């Protein structure tokens, strides 16, 4: 009887203490969301990497219904965690593992529905048992948790030691290896999927930040230095962890590396004790984005063709599917615009910002995409995205939307082409038809209802290169996505134009 009474007072106390703490584990990329009766400031919701729990019990004659999170580290022993156990006479507890699965009502344990027929007084021996039992069990739980944490730490340190002893890693980061050597190794590696994770961590944690060069909705972009070379460091805020993970994942797709796609170097999460910084390290291009470049400079016909052809080459490589054991899935960008294309020293483009990209698995014919039709920048959205008629289950639909946006980028480039001393000032597409920050409704009215497109000047017809560019733009802007050019067709047309204009690529 003493043991039963001790458990009766201990388990409700543990459940109440756990509910008071919110029970949330470390936030992860796929955190589990649970109902939480004590999380007033978090809208009665908590996040965990473990399980959701709901429990009902009587304490001092009062009925308590508790919902909370159980961190993964506290789900011990495996398969039958203490926190998830019920007792026929003491409490009713249920653990589950899907979002908000603990929003259920449990029945009060049957033992609490009956009044004891023969109440008895507790003697000294019973009191000792009541006090000692819960204390012993609490110490047992603490010891188990400590052993589990210690085990995971030993496994982690062993992995680090193995990484450091890996001769391939030692070779990758020998002291005389420069940034140029590292980039060359990336370009010539067989997998084309990036550096080993250990090397990425080491590179990221030895970069010295120099100056901030840009800001966006995700965070900041810095110029950094590593072994005498410049790198670009995109620093995500902690609330953008999903975006950081997604972009790093896309950049490390097998066979993605291409001269016209921004070169990925490393990804790392840096914890300074106060907050976590999420880093994405890539090649640095001093000209910045195509948007910045066109605002500062005009371009020659040769420069226009190089920019347009390299952008088409990068997009064609993204869209292309390579079948085989070392194959590459088709990738659609979904946020193509002049601010997401960088200009290299040689006047060529490199497509960047793949955080919203989707990949297509040709074997299963599936697309890894969140169920959200409206993404990207409103000004560059294709008609089918604006009016929500895009077929989200068909990968070609996303490629067609990219082509529409590429046509708008070409319009921005061609306006800045200096032909015979004539050029126009830089403007964004639809600058004369919508406000500086247009809404979906404003863009839909112009693009879908009125079927308007950016103006192509008549004087472009006087120059073969501008005439070809204008014709391609119109074929990129068709309302019917299936009628638009493909990236590969655009690349071939511009390659022929470069030969005609004697452009050295």
From Swiss-Prot:
Membrane topology: Single-pass type I membrane protein
All ranges on the Cytoplasmic side of the membrane: 150-505
Keyword Magnesium: yes
UniProt cofactor(s): Mg(2+); Mn(2+)
GTP-binding is among the record's keywords: no
Consequence recorded when altering residue 75 to A: Decreases binding to activin
Subcellular location: Cell membrane
Pathological association: ACVRIB is abundantly expressed in systemic sclerosis patient fibroblasts and production of collagen is also induced by activin-A/INHBA. This suggests that the activin/ACRV1B signaling mechanism is involved in systemic sclerosis.
Function in brief: Transmembrane serine/threonine kinase activin type-1 receptor forming an activin receptor complex with activin receptor type-2 (ACVR2A or ACVR2B). Transduces the activin signal from the cell surface to the cytoplasm and is thus regulating a many physiological and pathological processes including neuronal differentiation and neuronal survival, hair follicle development and cycling, FSH production by the pituitary gland, wound healing, extracellular matrix production, immunosuppression and carcinogenesis.
Protein name, per record: Activin receptor type-1B
Gene: ACVR1B
């Amino acid at each position: 009887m003493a043991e039963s009474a001790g458990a009766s007072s201990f388990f409700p106390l543990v459940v109440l203490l756990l509910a008071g703490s919110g029970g949330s584990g470390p936030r992860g990329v796929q955190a589990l969301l649970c109902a939480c009766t004590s999380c007033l400031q978090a809208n009665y919701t908590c996040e965990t990497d473990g399980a959701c729990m709901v429990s009902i019990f009587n304490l001092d004659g009062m009925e308590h219904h508790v919902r909370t999170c159980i961190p993964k580290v506290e789900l011990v022993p495996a398969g039958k965690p203490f926190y998830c156990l019920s007792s026929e006479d003491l409490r009713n507890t249920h653990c589950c593992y899907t979002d908000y699965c603990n929003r259920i009502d449990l029945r009060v344990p049957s033992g609490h529905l009956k009044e004891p027929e023969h109440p008895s007084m507790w003697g000294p021996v019973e009191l000792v048992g009541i006090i000692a039992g819960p204390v012993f069990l609490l110490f047992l739980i603490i010891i188990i948790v400590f052993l589990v944490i210690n085990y995971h730490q030993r496994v982690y340190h062993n992995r680090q030691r193995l990484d450091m002893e890996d001769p391939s890693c030692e070779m990758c980061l020998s002291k005389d290896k420069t940034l140029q050597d590292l980039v060359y190794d990336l370009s010539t590696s067989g997998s084309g999927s990036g550096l080993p994770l250990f090397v990425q961590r080491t590179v990221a944690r030895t970069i010295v930040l120099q100056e901030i060069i840009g800001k966006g909705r995700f965070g900041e972009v810095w110029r950094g230095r590593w072994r005498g070379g410049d790198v670009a460091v995109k620093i995500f805020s902690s609330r953008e962890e999903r975006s950081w993970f997604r972009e790093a994942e896309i950049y490390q797709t097998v066979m993605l590396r291409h001269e016209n796609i921004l070169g990925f170097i490393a990804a790392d999460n840096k914890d300074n004790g106060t907050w976590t910084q999420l880093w994405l390290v890539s090649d640095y291009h001093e000209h910045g984005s195509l948007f910045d470049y066109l605002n500062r400079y005009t371009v020659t016909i040769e420069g226009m063709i190089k920019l347009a052809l390299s952008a088409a080459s990068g997009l064609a490589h993204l869209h292309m599917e390579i079948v085989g054991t070392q194959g590459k899935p088709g990738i659609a960008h979904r946020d193509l615009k002049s601010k997401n294309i960088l200009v290299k020293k040689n006047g060529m483009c490199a497509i960047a910002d793949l955080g919203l990209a989707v990949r297509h698995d040709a074997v299963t014919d599936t697309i890894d995409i969140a169920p959200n039709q409206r993404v990207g920048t409103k000004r560059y959205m294709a008609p089918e995205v604006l009016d929500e008629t895009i077929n989200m289950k068909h990968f070609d639909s996303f490629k067609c939307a990219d082509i529409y946006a590429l046509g708008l980028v070409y319009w921005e480039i061609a306006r800045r082409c200096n032909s015979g001393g004539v050029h126009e000032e830089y403007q964004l597409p639809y600058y004369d038809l919508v406000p500086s920050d247009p809404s979906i409704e404003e863009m839909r009215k112009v693009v879908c209802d009125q079927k308007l497109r950016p103006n192509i000047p008549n004087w472009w017809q006087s120059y073969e290169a501008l005439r070809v560019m204008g014709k391609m733009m119109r074929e990129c802007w068709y309302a019917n996505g299936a009628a638009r050019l493909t990236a590969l067709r655009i690349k071939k047309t511009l390659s022929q134009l470069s030969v005609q204009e004697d452009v050295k690529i």
